């Protein structure tokens, strides 16, 4: 029995299983090793009208309220929209509710060369950012269904575009100021609340993101079963609870328990995440806040924060400012906006390894200016770092290859006597000073690095639209001509030929067909990831061939 080969096959199988399980968890689905399966999201509203938009459940002792349209309310689809734009971002704000109902990323283009849209409010897709007021015993306050009028707009003294919208109901006036900084995906949203007439009820400002449960279409056959999956859904951050993703399935089942009240002075934010991009409300931390989430309608969900404004004296005003981020998950940029916001770029469980790997990849790119060559150079550096371990593994394989004829003879000699065969093999390993498991440890140690690099390449928006050479115009999508996956399959086949042939015929066939199985999967993986794998395989082949030469054995044919 070839112990080393068996262990290696078990390690690679377990690694593949764990990697697939990580995809499932990252996508918001339960782990294969525990928990009930996720329920299928309900079908979206397809009646042709946008889904209903109700006010949120108030927290901190304030009962739930259900908003009914009033004389000061208007359907979103029939209202005027106002546009703010800088060189990176174009947003539309509706007069109904003063909600952000459309956001285009002008520098991030789709396959048909149109700007990527984050926020949208159409009959088939709902994804908006909204805010408003609630209070005990008074549901008729300015909220996300109220009709807002334009007070003023233009550019401030620094040339920044802005607009001010206001609405007054039941003695409370809410003014919303939207302002865009140049070269920024960050929208300043100021809420100016004025108590016009006496009203003793404490006021609460809510800022929330509403989205349907639709996800990105997977590429490939069988519903994209072999394509790389990423998480789509809400995420929250508090100074105490740190970063947490919330699946739509958990909201559907009421499994998510929001953190307790965030004290004044402590950071916190809520976000909606998708592959490469995100939106986030970041309220001012000067006032206490509460995080909430919930299901609004059929396949329509929300996550938000409620800021406690307290009781406002008649004739006085309270300001509650917030930032609304809408843009790509560029780690360095996110770090400058709010504490913990860089966690929107999710590296999975091995963040502690993935972060320095991306740091190194980024610095290589700053030198060579091409992400494809950066991946290749990073792979070379990682290979050099693990050279001593890899060399030990390949030396062990080479020694095993030398004794293959003797192993075959033993198998024939002790046919039908497995116990004696194992004893004879162990005695031979002892005399030849061969550790049959010597090639396993180096492989096991390198697995976390491979998984970390996988998440770096999968989650980095910098790869989106980044070309390499010739036919590779975008490292974030599969190779359009499948050249890299074919090269990868060939390189894996060559590697199996360089390794000692397992004495077990079944095991030998498994090793022979493994490149084909892996290739089917990698046909639909991002080209950047396949490029890493191909480079790693070619370097491994060169290293193993050289070690085989040093041991005086030519690769098997």
Swiss-Prot record:
Drop me one GO molecular function for this one: membrane insertase activity
Oligomeric state and interaction partners are given as:
Interacts with the Sec translocase complex via SecD. Specifically interacts with transmembrane segments of nascent integral membrane proteins during membrane integration.
What GO cellular component is one of the record's annotations? plasma membrane
Entry membrane topology: Multi-pass membrane protein
Q: What does this protein do?
A: Required for the insertion and/or proper folding and/or complex formation of integral membrane proteins into the membrane. Involved in integration of membrane proteins that insert both dependently and independently of the Sec translocase complex, as well as at least some lipoproteins. Aids folding of multispanning membrane proteins.
- Pfam families, per database record: 60KD_IMP, YidC_periplas
Question: What family does the entry list?
Answer: Belongs to the OXA1/ALB3/YidC family. Type 1 subfamily.
Name of the coding gene: yidC
Intracellular or extracellular location(s): Cell inner membrane
> What's this protein's name?
Membrane protein insertase YidC
Q: Which keywords does UniProt give here?
A: Cell inner membrane, Cell membrane, Chaperone, Membrane, Protein transport, Transmembrane, Transmembrane helix, Transport
Q: Where are the transmembrane segments?
A: 6-26, 219-239, 367-387, 437-457, 514-534
Keyword match Protein transport: yes
Task: Write down the InterPro entries for this protein, in alphabetical order.
Answer: Membr_insert_YidC, Membr_insert_YidC_N, YidC/ALB3/OXA1/COX18, YidC/Oxa/ALB_C, YidC_ALB_C, YidC_periplasmic_sf
Q: What is its main location?
A: membrane
- The UniProt record lists the keyword Zinc-finger: no
């Amino acid at each position: 029995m070839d112990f080393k080969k068996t262990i290696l096959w078990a390690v690679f199988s377990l690694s593949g299983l764990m990697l697939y399980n990580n995809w499932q968890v990252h996508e918001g689905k339960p782990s294969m090793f525990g928990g009930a399966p996720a329920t299928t999201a309900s079908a979206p509203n397809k009646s042709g009208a946008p889904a209903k938009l109700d006010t949120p459940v108030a927290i901190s002792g304030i009962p739930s309220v259900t908003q009914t349209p009033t004389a000061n309310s208007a359907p979103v689809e029939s209202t005027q929209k106002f546009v703010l734009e800088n060189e990176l971002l174009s947003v539309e704000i509706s007069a109904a509710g003063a909600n952000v109902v459309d956001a285009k990323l002008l520098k991030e283009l789709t396959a048909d060369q149109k700007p990527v849209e984050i926020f949208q409010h159409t009959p088939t897709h709902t994804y908006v950012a909204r805010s408003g007021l609630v209070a005990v015993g008074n549901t008729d306050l300015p909220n996300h269904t109220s009709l807002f009028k334009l007070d003023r707009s233009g550019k401030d003294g620094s040339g920044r575009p802005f607009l001010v919208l206001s609405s007054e109901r039941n003695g409370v006036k809410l003014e919303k100021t939207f302002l865009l900084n140049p070269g920024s995906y960050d929208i300043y949203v100021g809420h100016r609340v004025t108590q016009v007439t006496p009203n003793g009820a404490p006021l609460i400002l809510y800022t929330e993101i509403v989205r349907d449960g639709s996800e990105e279409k997977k590429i490939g056959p069988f519903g994209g079963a072999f394509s790389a999956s990423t998480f789509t859904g809400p995420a929250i951050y508090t100074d105490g609870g740190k970063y947490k993703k919330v699946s739509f399935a958990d909201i559907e089942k009421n499994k998510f328990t929001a953190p307790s009240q965030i004290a004044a002075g402590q950071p916190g934010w809520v976000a909606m995440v998708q592959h490469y991009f995100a939106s986030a409300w970041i309220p001012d931390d000067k006032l206490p806040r509460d995080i909430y989430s919930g299901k609004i309608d059929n396949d329509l969900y929300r996550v938000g924060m409620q800021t406690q404004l307290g009781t406002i004296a008649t004739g006085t005003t309270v300001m509650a400012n917030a930032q609304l981020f809408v843009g790509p998950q560029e780690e360095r940029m996110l770090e400058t906006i709010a504490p913990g916001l860089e966690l929107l770029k999710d590296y999975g469980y091995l963040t502690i390894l993935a972060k320095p790997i991306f740091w190194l990849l980024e610095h290589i790119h700053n030198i060579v200016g091409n992400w494809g060559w950066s991946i290749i150079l990073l792979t070379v550096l990682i290979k050099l770092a693990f050279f001593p371990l890899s060399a030990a593994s390949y030396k062990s394989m080479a020694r095993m290859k030398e004794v293959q004829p003797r192993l075959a003879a033993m198998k024939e000699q002790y046919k039908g006597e497995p116990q004696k065969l194992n004893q004879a093999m162990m005695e031979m390993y002892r005399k030849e000073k061969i550790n049959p498991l010597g090639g396993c440890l180096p492989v096991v140690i390198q697995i976390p690095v491979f998984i970390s690099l996988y998440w770096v390449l999968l989650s980095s928006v910098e790869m989106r639209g980044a070309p390499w050479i010739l036919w590779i115009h975008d490292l974030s999508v599969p190779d359009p001509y499948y050249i890299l996956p074919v090269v990868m399959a060939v390189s894996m086949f060559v590697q199996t030929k360089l390794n000692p042939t397992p004495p077990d015929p079944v095991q030998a066939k498994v090793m022979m067909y493994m490149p084909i199985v892996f290739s089917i999967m990698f046909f639909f993986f991002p080209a950047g990831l396949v490029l890493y794998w191909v480079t790693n395989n070619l370097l491994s082949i060169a290293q193993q061939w050289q070690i085989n030469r040093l041991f005086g054995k030519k690769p098997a044919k």
